[in-house]
Amino acid sequence: MQISIITVGKLKEKYLREGIDEYSKRLSAYCKLQVIEVNDEKAPEEMSAAEMEQVKRKEGERILAQIKQDQYVIALAIDGQMWSSEKLSAEMDKLALHGRSQVAFVIGGSLGLADQVLKRADALLSFSKMTFPHQLVRLVLLEQVYRAFRISRGEPYHK
């Protein structure tokens, strides 16, 4: 399976980079992983609703340019469905069974995802109703994808 993580912005924090590197290494035994970082838009603290939409639209265009036609797209969105680790594993197994071996997970910037990205998504996934920094979500996502592969193969994992 080929997993792409398409995310807005560069990772700056060393502790997150170390965690992401660790899970990327672990995932190499299960899939081909690609992390694609698209540039984020400069966004001042105070913005109008129209300015926020413009930032999301520009970031969204960059995201959409990275999505391949045949990829199954799972967008991380606060209004998405909340899945257990077992459900994520089952969904990934189902995709593989149906020949959908290219999966893209999309993580938006600090303002979230543009409507055009949400419309392109085949599924919307939420980790929580809480808001998390998008850089931290990248680490949590990689851990959950790793856990999903372990569950699928009947290998031990922490519950």
UniProtKB/Swiss-Prot annotation:
The lineage of its organism: Bacteria, Bacillati, Bacillota, Bacilli, Bacillales. NCBIfam families: PRK00103.1-3 (NF000985), PRK00103.1-4 (NF000986), tRNA_RlmH_YbeA (TIGR00246). Gene3D superfamilies: 3.40.1280.10. Homodimer. This is Ribosomal RNA large subunit methyltransferase H. HAMAP family: 23SrRNA_methyltr_H. It is found in: Cytoplasm. GO terms for cellular component: cytoplasm. It catalyses: pseudouridine(1915) in 23S rRNA + S-adenosyl-L-methionine = N(3)-methylpseudouridine(1915) in 23S rRNA + S-adenosyl-L-homocysteine + H(+). Disulfide bonds: none annotated. Specifically methylates the pseudouridine at position 1915 (m3Psi1915) in 23S rRNA. Its main location: cytoplasm. Its EC number is 2.1.1.177. The keyword Cytoplasm applies. It comes from the Bacteria. The keyword Methyltransferase applies. InterPro entries: Alpha/beta_knot_MTases, RlmH-like, tRNA_m1G_MTases_N. S-adenosyl-L-methionine binds at L76, G108, F127, S128, K129, M130, T131, F132. Belongs to the RNA methyltransferase RlmH family. Keywords: Cytoplasm, Methyltransferase, rRNA processing, S-adenosyl-L-methionine, Transferase. GO terms for molecular function: rRNA (pseudouridine-N3-)-methyltransferase activity.
